[in-house]
Amino acid sequence: MKGNEIRSRFLEYFKGNGHTVAESSSLVPKDDPTLLFTNAGMVQFKRVFMGDDKRGYVRAVTSQKCVRAGGKHNDLENVGYTARHHTFFEMLGNFSFGDYFKEEAIRLAWNFLTVELGLPAEKMWVSVFEDDDEAFALWEKVEDLPKGRIVRLGEKDNFWAMGDTGPCGPCSEIHIDQGVGSSPCDNPNCAVGCDCDRFLELWNLVFMQFNRAEDGSLTALPRPSIDTGMGLERVAAVLQGKFNNYDSDLFAPIIAVLEDISGVKYGAAADTDTAIRVIADHARATSFLVADGVLPSNEGRGYVLRRIMRRAVRYGKKLGLEKPFMDRVTKAVCAEMQNAYPQLVATAALLEKVVNNEEERFRETLEHGLVQLDEKISQLLTSGGDAVIDGPFIFKLYDTFGFPFDIVRDIALERGVGFDEAGFATAMAEQRAKSRASRKGEGVKLHDEGVKALADAGKKAEFLGYEGLEADSVVEGLLSEQGSGVEKLVAGEKGRVFVAATPFYAEAGGQMGDRGSVRWQGGQASVYATQAEGTGLILHDLLVEEGELSLGLEVTLQVDDEERKATASNHSATHLLQAALISVLGDHVKQSGSLVGPERLRFDFTNFSQLTAAEIAQVETLVNEQIRNNAVIATDVLSKQEAIAGGATALFGEKYDDDVRVVSMGDYSRELCGGTHVGATGEIGLFVILSESGIAAGVRRIEALTGRAALAYVQGRLSTGNELADLLSCKSGDLVPKVESLLTAVKEGEKRVAQLAGQLASSGLDDLLNNALTVAGIKVVVAEVPLENAKALRELGDKVRDNLESGIAVIGGAVGGKVALLAIVTKDLVDRIQAGRIVSEVSGIVGGKGGGRPDMAQAGGTMPDKLSEAIASVPAIIEAML
């Protein structure tokens, strides 16, 4: 059975058993700072299991994209060397949120494996937690599970916990006996629980029934849940009679491409087999990480991706691949998996650019780094001491050549030397500490005690700002400027206020929070920021200008009308801008960030090259065309699945509720967005791009203006153009050719001036030579000459040298408020006196220094008023040196 069929059967089977098919979440977890990547099917349901979130269903089934590389769950160093380790894999899982429990989970899993997939029951084994008598008894009731096939194991193997505290529970694993000889094993008592692959774990059923307190005690959860996981790659290999995941059909097309481009046959040799497996795996991880918005960088998720990509390139060298090849391999990944994951098609162009750019950049430094590493290892192996690559050296390779630690480790293991991982980590930590220190002072959002108290009290605000800009409400919470709860704020004090309902939009989704005022009988305050805290809290940062603001007071909240309109205009323009960028550059364009305020907008997006002037103009034109179309901007609340299916654009990594707000601008733009917008595109008025720049590898930034700000900018540019036209006595439309003509004339004039200066300096050559002095029997030419530039002095010096058969010359002049000196000694005299010594001595008088060859030397100085004195001293200086 093919891997794609297994995936489809799994989803359809559980759908037929009352489960909702939930789409795979992004590899970038939205609300879990403890994880670099989504590494299990339950990650997207973590808040559901903890009771902090609810879904519109109690049964779910997924085929979840997972990455285990970096952080606690890191399989990177094992990839390629074992039959089962991957950086990227798919986890098939079914989930129950307080619905069915152990008996149903066991029944569903057993039936799928033995009936749907046809795996032989006689080869199956089951493990349960040693104290889970309930699960043991339920498995004993499974009629076609052979007797004696249930094994009790300890907490290490069969008890699962989300963390040190929180939901946890025993688990039951289903294993298949692949037979003697299926996996190397030296244990004569090999059985379920052995580290070899003979008794291969297929499926893990987690019974979340307890909550673990900080003291380690367990209490029963009111609504026990189910979380299961089965690796698609693993079950595909088993069904296809393979003992290695990489031998299944999921990898075959990728390996075939590698065989084609390298000329190396898979299965020919152990070392090249390892390289092929590494590249095949890493190409899958690269393809899906880029598709989910991760780009190579030097920190966080981007650094893990860079490590994966560069490790693949390095293993490519083992296959003789000296030219870029990863693009062809990732294309094979996309071709194989695009039906199950259509986003691979949408991001194909971006993936191609990312892969080619990263591989080319790394290849530029790879050879240099490999040479240094090889020299280091050779030195260690011949030194007779401990053959350990020191941490600072490994860090130097990382910092200078972009060598991830993994590459150094792999090569060290291959060459039989040690590596100082702790020393490398220390050097890395020191660098990060310096980086953090340099960023000291950047703003940090604090969740203080007052905010926590409001959240714990279940406070939530109703947002009324879509319908109007003014609303009456009641003060339900007050915080001091320091963040603690207070009863009142008086005139002159800053603080934060929470009300039951507000028209103020809280900063979110890149849109700045509203500003405005709060009024009450006998007082008022100015709101200078609005922020969202926790779940549902909207806090107004304000300054009390008059009166006393206290709890329970009835107030009127008024959003600044002009600022809201300007912000809405800029926000709507960012939607049009993204659509225009996709139209001009391609579907790889994805939003990477934005900042929308009343003054201007900033939009960050993925693209691996600078936009040309023509592309910028085209984008600007497209946006303004949509503004002139004056399309109605409509908002609808739809299910997330319905919105995405309808073509709505979602922000990578953003977590959305099951019901989402969709903002549509005619047929041109359709995005998931909770921000505020104008009523029709025509209200934007005008759109002008101020700048386009790069902010990171593969990320560009556009800053732009709309409405009145854009008009003022254009008027300012026109005014400046008119002033320049008046100054140059031409029409505004002729400014460019007029300026080009003037620049050409200036350059020609400068060239002519330089020529004349050279001629003027050279014209006195005969006079210089005829007026030469004699010092100790040697002809000495000494002169102070007018100079246009330093080049004129060198040209004069060349002519003096060519015409001075035997002698010394020292020439000086003032250029741009500084002194330029030149000394020449003919070759027959350099054994007696050197030009460098002469010019060094003379330049000291004019506050400078210099040097050069024995026959010619130059110097500079900062005291042109001392030049005559310096020139006059030359004969005495030469006489003293002879």
Swiss-Prot record:
Originating organism: Desulfotalea psychrophila (strain LSv54 / DSM 12343)
Class in the EC hierarchy, top level:
ligase
Keywords recorded for this protein, A-Z: Aminoacyl-tRNA synthetase, ATP-binding, Cytoplasm, Ligase, Metal-binding, Nucleotide-binding, Protein biosynthesis, RNA-binding, tRNA-binding, Zinc
Signal peptide positions on this chain = none
Q: Which GO terms describe its molecular function?
A: alanine-tRNA ligase activity; aminoacyl-tRNA deacylase activity; ATP binding; tRNA binding; zinc ion binding
> So which cofactors does this thing need?
Zn(2+)
According to the UniProt record, one GO cellular component term is:
cytosol
- Which reactions fall under this protein's catalytic activity? tRNA(Ala) + L-alanine + ATP = L-alanyl-tRNA(Ala) + AMP + diphosphate
Could you tell me which PROSITE patterns the record lists for this protein? AA_TRNA_LIGASE_II_ALA (PS50860)
What's a single GO BP term from this record? alanyl-tRNA aminoacylation
Q: What does this protein do?
A: Catalyzes the attachment of alanine to tRNA(Ala) in a two-step reaction: alanine is first activated by ATP to form Ala-AMP and then transferred to the acceptor end of tRNA(Ala). Also edits incorrectly charged Ser-tRNA(Ala) and Gly-tRNA(Ala) via its editing domain.
Entry annotated with the keyword Methyltransferase: no
InterPro entries assigned to the protein according to its UniProt record, in alphabetical order:
aa-tRNA-synth_II/BPL/LPL, Ala-tRNA-lgiase_IIc, Ala-tRNA-ligase_IIc_anticod-bd, Ala-tRNA-synth_IIc_core, Ala-tRNA-synth_IIc_N, Ala-tRNA_ligase, Ala_tRNA_ligase_euk/bac, DHHA1_dom
Q: What is this protein called?
A: Alanine--tRNA ligase
UniProt KW Nucleus keyword: no
- State the free-text cofactor note: Binds 1 zinc ion per subunit.
Q: HAMAP family of this UniProt entry?
A: Ala_tRNA_synth_B (MF_00036_B)
The residues the record assigns to binding Zn(2+) are: H571, H575, C673, H677
Query: Know anything about its domains from the record?
Result: Consists of three domains; the N-terminal catalytic domain, the editing domain and the C-terminal C-Ala domain. The editing domain removes incorrectly charged amino acids, while the C-Ala domain, along with tRNA(Ala), serves as a bridge to cooperatively bring together the editing and aminoacylation centers thus stimulating deacylation of misacylated tRNAs.
Q: What is its EC number?
A: 6.1.1.7
In which family does this protein belong, per the annotation?
Answer: Belongs to the class-II aminoacyl-tRNA synthetase family.
Q: Where in the cell is it found?
A: Cytoplasm
Report the gene name.
Answer: alaS
Q: What is its main location?
A: cytoplasm
